[in-house]
C-alpha cells in the first residue's frame, strides 16, 4: 500500500512517448515515484502500477510534488528530510534549506525552449491549444482568457467546431474564460463529437446554477441518448446544482436508462439529486413515483427505492412518514414494497418507532408477510412472542437473532430480560452475546452483574470485552468485576486503561480496590 501525496497526468514532449497520459504519483514514505496506467471503469477509471521510475535509498529523499514543466519535462520537488512527521514540523526540527528540485526527462528528447507565450498573438496562442505540452495548452488558455478580446471569440468558436481533440476542449475553456460562451453556442456544442467538450459545456453552463430554457431542454434530450458515461455523469453532477424544476427532470431521464446500473458513481449521483430535494420539495420527488413505469426502472429499483424510503423514515416527521405511505401505496408489486420496507427497517433500527400517521399504519398492516422484526416494532404482541422464541433458538441464524434482539429491546425490554439473561449464561455465538449484553446494560439489576461475572472465564473471546465494559458501567456491578480479577478468573491485562478510568469514577470504595 502507498500514500501518494501528489499525482499528475504526464503530458510533456520531453517525456517518453509511451508515458504520455499515464499517471505519475509521488510516494515520499517509500522514497519513490510510481508510474501507473489508467483503465476505463464506467464514468471513472481504475489504475495499475507499472514501475518506479525514480527511487532512492537515501533515507532523506522525500518526493512530495511534481509538475509538467514548460520545457516538456517533469519537475520533482524533494522535501529532503529524514523525518517528515508533523511532530518534527511544528517543533521546527526540520532544515528549511535542504529541499531539492529534480528534472525528469527522456534520453534523447529535446526540451522545448519556446516558453514566452505572453509575447504571442491571439492567433498564435490558438495554434498552441493542441500542443503536446500540458503547460503550453493551459498557459495559452489562461492568456486568451485574460486578454478577453471579443475579436478572438469568432475564431475560437470556429476552432472548437472544426477540431475534435485537445484543441477543441482547450478552445472551449479559452472561450469561456474570455466571456464568449453564450447559451446558443453552448447548445450547439452539445452535439460536438468530443465527449469531453459535451461534458464541459454542461459543467460550465451549470456553474450559473440555472440553465437557460433552451439549453436545459437540449441537455434533457441529450440525457436520453448520450452514449458516453462521463457525459452522463456530468449531467447528473450538474443536475444536483440546479433548482428542482431542472434538476429532478434530468435525474429522472438518467434513471430511466440501464447503461449505468453497475457504474460506480452515476446511480449515486442521481440519488443525491433526489435526496437534495426530498426535504423542501418532497412532493415533487414523490410525484416521480406516481408513474408506475418510473417505479419499474431497474436503476430506480436497485439504487433509489430503498434509499429514498430510508431517508424519509429516518427524519421521522409526520410529512416524511406520510411520504413513506405514499410510496408504499404507489408500489406496483410486492418486490417493490419489499425494497421500500428494507429501507424503512434500516431507518428505525435501534430506536423506538415514532408515532405513525394513519396512512402509513394502514399500509404497514396491509403488507404481505411483513418481516418479524418490523411486526415487533409495530407493537404486535404475537410477533413479540415469536421473536422471543427465535432469539432463544440456537439453530436460527445469528444475524436474524441479533436483529430481533434489537427490535424487541427497543419495544419491551422487560419481557426480553429473561431471554437475554439466558443467552449470557449459555450462548456460544459472540455476536448474539454482545447484543444481549448491550440491552441488558440498560436494566438496573444487581443480579445481572452476578450472572455476567459468573461467565467471564468462558465467554466467547469476542464478547468478553463487552462483558467487562458491562460490569464496569455501574458501581454495583463493578465489584463483581474486581472479584473476578482478584480471584484469577480474569487477567489484569484484560482490563483496558479506559475501563480503569470508568472504575475510578465510581467512588472511593471501588477506586481503592482498583488501585
Where are these regions (language model features)?
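Beta-propeller domains with acidic blade repeats across secreted/periplasmic ectodomains
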Residues: 1-124, 135, 145
